[in-house]
Structure formats: structure tokens, C-alpha cells
Amino acid sequence: MIIIRHEQPEDASRIREVNELAFGQPAEADLVETLRQTGADSVSLVAEDDGVVGHILFTSVVVESAGQRVLGMGLAPMAVLPDRQRQGIGSQLVRRGLDILRERGCPFVVVVGHPAFYPRFGFEPASSHGLACQWEGVPDAAFMVLVLDAHAMAGVSGLAKYKDEFNEVA
């Protein structure tokens, strides 16, 4: 049985391993560790099934629009061990993370991800809400937003800016 819970300090090495195995490189694992060390505002969850088998991280994203700053969250990265993928673990992580963010009053969540996966959670192309990705070359269909508070997002448009640490990911 999969248990989704908040990351604990003793999970750090296993989270690193899960990210490295899922992505086939250390860049995402390095990013998670850097964000953890800088104390970034985040929600970090693990999927546990006789050990950590998945991880998801949400960190703050800012949209500057008409002189105001709207703070939301960005989903990245999400990782599931390769031999545990396609079993619904990633979906459980996303759903629990979004539930927590709704409870906290987060107005929006953005993701750069697979356009066949994230729409099942309500994500739509961010451009349809007037939001743009800070990185050039990201396909329009891959940069998505889930608006959690339509009132807070009314009239908001502009560039969604992730934490600077994301610019270091190769």
C-alpha cells in the first residue's frame, strides 16, 4: 500500500536516489538538494511502499502582473523509481500535493511537463491564462497551469518565474 507523506530529514538520500534513477542523471537530484539547503518555500512529498519509491516537489513561483506580484507554486521535479512507474504513484503524489496547496490557499500551480499526463489533474496550457514560461524553447503545450483560486488570478498575466536555482539545471 502506497503512503504519501511529507519528506523527513532521513529521506534525503533516498530522494536523491529516486530522482537520479528516474531521470538518469544527477541534475534534478542536485536541484532538490540545493532547494532544500536554501530553505526554499516548498512542499516536498514522498511515496512510500516499503521504502521511498517516489518524490514530488513544489516550490514558489512568482508572476509579476500590472505592478503586483502573485505568488504560486511550481511542480518540479516529480520522480518515481523506473520499476514502479505506470502504477499510479505519480498521480497519487500530484493529487496529494495539489490538495495541500489548495488547503494553503495557493492561487495557482505551474508545471513544465508532459501534455498527456498533467491535464488529468486540471492543468491547461498556461498561455490560455496569459502566463508565459521564463525559459525559451518550452513548447506551449508543455507549460501548463492549474488555477486554484480564480478570484486571485483574475486579470493576472505575465512571466512565471521559478526560483533562480532552476536556471542551474542542465
At which residue positions do the language-model features occur?
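Short amphipathic alpha-helix that is part of the acyltransferase structural core
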Residues: 1-33, 38-53, 74, 143, ...
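Short acidic (Asp/Glu) patches
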Residues: 59, 93, 97, 125-130
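A conserved beta-turn-beta hairpin within the catalytic core of GNAT-like acetyltransferases
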Residues: 62-74, 85
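Conserved glycine-rich acetyl-CoA-binding loop
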Residues: 69, 81-92, 103-104, 120-121
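Conserved acetyl-CoA-binding loop-helix of GNAT-fold acetyltransferases
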Residues: 75, 80, 86-99, 111
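Accessory recognition modules or surfaces
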Residues: 86-87, 91, 136-149
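Conserved active-site alpha-helix within GNAT-family acetyltransferase domains
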Residues: 103-107, 112-138
